[in-house]
Curated annotation (Swiss-Prot):
It comes from Neisseria meningitidis serogroup B (strain ATCC BAA-335 / MC58). This is Acetylornithine aminotransferase. It is an enzyme of class 2 (transferase). Pathway: Amino-acid biosynthesis; L-arginine biosynthesis; N(2)-acetyl-L-ornithine from L-glutamate: step 4/4. Pyridoxal 5'-phosphate binds at F129, D214, E215, V216, Q217, T272. Its EC number is 2.6.1.11. N(2)-acetyl-L-ornithine binds at R132, S271. Its cofactor is pyridoxal 5'-phosphate. The gene is argD. It is found in: Cytoplasm. It catalyses: N(2)-acetyl-L-ornithine + 2-oxoglutarate = N-acetyl-L-glutamate 5-semialdehyde + L-glutamate. The modification N6-(pyridoxal phosphate)lysine is found at K243. Pfam families: Aminotran_3 (PF00202).
């Protein structure tokens, strides 16, 4: 198939055509077990019947009406998010980048309205990832993503992740917000320590700064709780969500307390497609399935099984030195001898019929459906073991 798309993506050699649950079939009819979940998006697997029904019902009612009006699906999903989190208000958009852009803009506007123009600095983490807009790619602490787009937005300070002393040194009266991923996703599935996030909360309180948690990847059940902050004994001021929020239908959301959200008066921010009725109808139905004790317990149980199985593969193949993460968001850290070869290993896995991800050059990422069953897990692990064994046997590394 000829490619008419811009070359900013390196496409895999297969073309997915249809999918159901945790199984995908390409244009040649070959089957794959999906351990990637569309990069932590397909939280209920592919084409979940309840989501198909929700989308089908809404598409016969209302597609788009603009944010001159509100709609029942948008209000219903917002109510569910508010009722099950710290937040009082929700801003809907289309992606994680847009959710983080809104969060950062809100933080700066809130600080300006309340404290004047001198309180605008944003503190973020090295190796973080918050999106691809010019603002969010600048806040993300990875120069490889931002260096080609200078001059970049200013007033951003980066500190090492999980380095409490560096965070304490950086946050001050000039700080309007600290933004942190509870688990750094793109940089290796690296969880924040409880002490680090609790220190961030304390510093923000001390200096009248806002704590923004980027839960684009960790939210909506991936860690075994609805939101990852629930593991840490803290509450943010602003939270970003996307990916699994729509389970494959594009939607993002920024959640905030009423006091902070009040800084966004009419005209201060917006989104043409934010709160789209179809997206919110799908998101609302997905929320009902994800936010249940049965689903969240299943995530914790299956996550433990998958982590144990991956550790077993580590012992058998010698490719990994560590498995880390929470729930069904896991990363396998490559052994020193195989560092930098994560992409080669994911390609080898694909040839054996299993879809996995990279998280940087040294980590294999797993973000399967939250409904992953034992049969699909076992078959995926069987295929993965064949791929890893073959890779280790034919690799140039000792």
């Amino acid at each position: 198939m000829q490619n008419y798309l811009t070359p900013n993506f390196a496409f895999a050699p297969m073309i997915p055509e249809r999918a159901s649950g945790s199984r995908v079939w390409d244009t040649k009819g070959r089957e794959y077990i999906d351990f990637s979940g569309g990069i932590a998006v397909n939280a209920l697997g592919h084409c979940h019947p309840a989501l198909v029904d929700a989308l089908n019902a809404q598409m016969h009612k209302l597609w788009h009406i603009s944010n001159i009006y509100t709609t029942r699906p948008a209000q219903e999903l917002a109510q569910k998010l508010v009722a099950n989190s710290f937040a009082d208000k929700v801003f809907f958009c289309n992606s994680g980048s847009e959710a983080n852009e809104a969060a950062l803009k809100l933080a700066r506007k809130y600080a300006r309205d309340r404290f004047g123009g001198g309180k605008s600095e944003i503190v973020a983490c090295i190796n973080s990832f918050h999106g691809r807009t010019l603002f969010t790619v600048s806040v993300g602490g990875q120069p490889k993503y931002s260096k080609d787009y200078a001059p970049l937005p200013q007033g951003i300070t980066h500190v090492p992740f999980n380095d409490i002393a560096a965070l304490e040194a950086a946050v001050g009266e000039q700080t309007c917000a600290v933004i942190i991923e509870p688990i750094q996703g793109e940089s290796g599935i690296l969880p924040a320590t409880a002490e680090y996030l609790q220190t961030a909360r304390r510093l923000c309180d001390r200096h009248n700064a806002l704590l923004i948690l980027d839960e684009v990847q960790t939210g909506m059940g991936h860690t075994g709780r609805l939101f990852a902050y629930e593991h840490y004994g803290i509450v943010p001021d602003i939270l970003s969500s996307a990916k699994a929020l729509g389970c494959g239908f594009p939607i993002g959301a920024m959640l905030a307390t009423e006091k902070i959200a009040a800084a966004f008066q009419p005209g201060t921010h917006g989104s043409t497609f934010g709160g789209n009725p179809m997206a919110c109808a799908v998101g609302s139905r997905a929320f009902d399935i994800i936010n249940t004790p049965e689903t969240l317990n299943h995530v914790r149980e299956q996550g433990q099984k998958l982590q144990t199985a991956l550790l077993d593969l580590c012992r058998k193949t010698g490719l990994f030195s560590q498995v880390r993460g929470m729930g069904l968001l896991l990363g396998c850290v490559l052994d020193e001898a195989y560092r930098g070869r994560a992409s080669e290993i994911t390609a080898a896995a694909l040839k054996h019929g299993v879809m996995i991800l990279v998280a940087g050059a040294d980590v294999l990422r797993f973000a399967p459906s939250l409904l992953l069953n034992d049969e699909d897990m076992a078959e995926g692990l069987r295929r993965l073991e064949h791929a890893l064994t073959e890779f280790a046997a034919t690799s140039d590394n000792p």
